[in-house]
Amino acid sequence: MKKSLLCLALLASFSTFSANYQAGDFVIRGGLTQVKPDSNQAGISLDGSALPLTLSPEDNTQLGLNFVYFYDQNWALEVLAATPFDHDIYLHDPTGATNSIYNIDLNDAKLANVKQLPPTISALYYFDTASVFKPYLGLGINYTVFFEEKFTATPKAAGFSDLSLDSSFGYSVQLGADYLLDDQWSLNVSARYIDINTQATFNVEDSLNVGGLVGKGKSNVDIDPMVYSLMLGYKF
């Protein structure tokens, strides 16, 4: 008898649980978001001449936030936000050019640090499912702004200064899924590609007085990251 009552109670709890989103539902999500830049290294030029140097940004993980508004059970609008991502940028000098010019080995050295915010607005399409598992596809637009760009101590001593990265405007595509825990709470996982391209500019001065390179440097960086999120959501 006790087992039967328990089964009935469980069935009753499931019967009152809607497995679909409705028009007007608003979901706030929070959790971990990782930005993983493209592994390709960006070339560097000085006054228009290519140098035997490349650079690459590192991954970073921050607190991610999502705000999702549903127009019906299939269509929703999502805004992606996060605390500022903090990327270390590494210099690659396989030929030893910096060592021969400045007597400083900068190969695979931490060149700089930069912060960025990549707010993204996406249209989401949720597939019809009769279960608590809700897969979706998303297409959106992204605007990434870079700030607090700075060289580390060693490159600064070699004359690198005035680092600046242009803001970027591009598209985003994503694949994700919600797992509904009850009427309010859900788990969310997503993977998205964001088209982020920026131009980094900087100055190079002969601060060590060794007859080193002097001029204006430039690098076109195709960051184009994959962005992975694991979040807990609450529906209002």
Describe the residue ranges of each PLM region:
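Extracellular loop and loop/strand-boundary signature of outer-membrane beta-barrel proteins
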Residues: 49-53, 104-112, 156-163, 214-220
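Outer-membrane beta-barrel translocator domains and adjoining extracellular loop/strand segments
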Residues: 40-47, 89-96, 147-158, 200-207
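Predominantly the C-terminal beta-signal and adjacent terminal strand-loop region
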Residues: 86-90, 100-102, 182-236
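Cleavable N-terminal export/targeting peptides
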Residues: 1-24
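Short sequence motifs at beta-strands and strand-loop junctions characteristic
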Residues: 55-61, 111-118, 163-170, 220-225
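Surface-exposed strand-loop-strand hairpins of Gram-negative outer-membrane beta-barrel proteins
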Residues: 36-63, 159-167
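Gram-negative (and chloroplast) outer-membrane scaffold detector with strong preference
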Residues: 19, 23-25, 34-36, 66-152, ...
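Transmembrane beta-barrel strand/turn architecture of Gram-negative outer membrane proteins
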Residues: 168-179
